[in-house]
A protein has these predicted regions:
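Alpha-helical interaction scaffolds
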Residues: 1-26, 32-34
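Hydrophobic/aromatic beta-strand patches that form the interior of the parallel beta-sheet core
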Residues: 2, 42, 97-100
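Active-site-proximal helix-loop-helix substrate-binding element of RNase H-like nuclease domains
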Residues: 9-16, 20, 37, 51, ...
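Short, hydrophobic/amphipathic alpha-helical packing segments
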Residues: 26, 30, 154-157
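Amphipathic alpha-helical segments that form well-ordered structural scaffolds
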Residues: 28, 53, 121, 159-163
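Proline-aspartate-enriched helix->loop->beta-strand connector
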Residues: 29-53
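Short secondary-structure boundary/capping segments
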Residues: 52-65, 178, 191-194
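Common nucleic-acid-contacting/processivity interface regions adjacent to the catalytic cores
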Residues: 139-195
Length: 195
């Protein structure tokens, strides 16, 4: 976990890197990313929130050349797509498959849910409830109780891990891609897999 303020944990499975500024944080993150270059990134709604936010901040603070460090091939591009009634900016990090668990869940589970918020899906699939935001906004939470704010974000990651442990949707995606001789993300479409 990378952050700007003090955070304390006794957990052996959580490492916290306290940074002096956003610039310092993103530099440390890029070094970590390159050292542990992922093949796949996942999370809940990462395609429309986490990845665009991260890419836009890196571009704004450092420029396009630093953004390219996310790709083992040095190629990152953005495009606008229309989904859920509005335009969204999304990024493709070449050489790193973005498998948004939100999309995997919608594609490979055949029961409509009343909500696709992670909290609801965690309750339906795992019997778990996420910690609620005790403040008016996430900004308030971040500013007034940084410790529990970071714990909440760790909980999000753990829920996606538990969903994968139970449902094996990434494993399914990889198996289908291997069998179909296509890229991992092609499995999320409707045509490419069958070509």
């Amino acid at each position: 976990v990378f952050g700007l303020h003090e955070f304390h944990t006794d957990r052996d499975d959580v490492t916290y890197v306290q940074c002096e500024s956003e610039v310092h944080l993103l530099k440390e993150f890029l070094v970590f990313w390159e050292k542990h270059q992922p093949d796949i990134i996942t999370g809940w709604n990462t395609e429309f929130f986490d990845i665009p936010y991260l890419c836009n901040r890196i571009t704004k603070l450092f420029g396009e050349d630093e953004l390219k460090r996310l790709s083992p091939w040095g190629v990152v591009y953005s495009k606008d797509i229309y989904k859920m009634g509005r335009n969204h900016q999304v990024y493709a990090i070449q050489g790193v498959a973005g498998l948004d668990y939100f999309d995997l869940y919608q594609k490979f589970t055949y029961t409509a849910q009343e909500s696709y918020r992670l909290d609801h899906i965690a309750f339906v699939e795992l019997g778990e409830k996420k910690t609620g935001n005790p403040y008016e906004t996430f900004k308030d939470w971040y500013q007034k109780d940084y410790q529990s704010f970071i714990e909440y974000n760790i909980q999000d990651v753990e829920i996606v891990d538990k969903l994968e442990d139970k449902m094996k949707l990434i494993e399914l995606c990889l198996t289908m891609a291997y069998d179909g001789k296509v890229n991992y993300t092609d499995v999320l479409g409707t045509v490419r897999y069958w070509d």
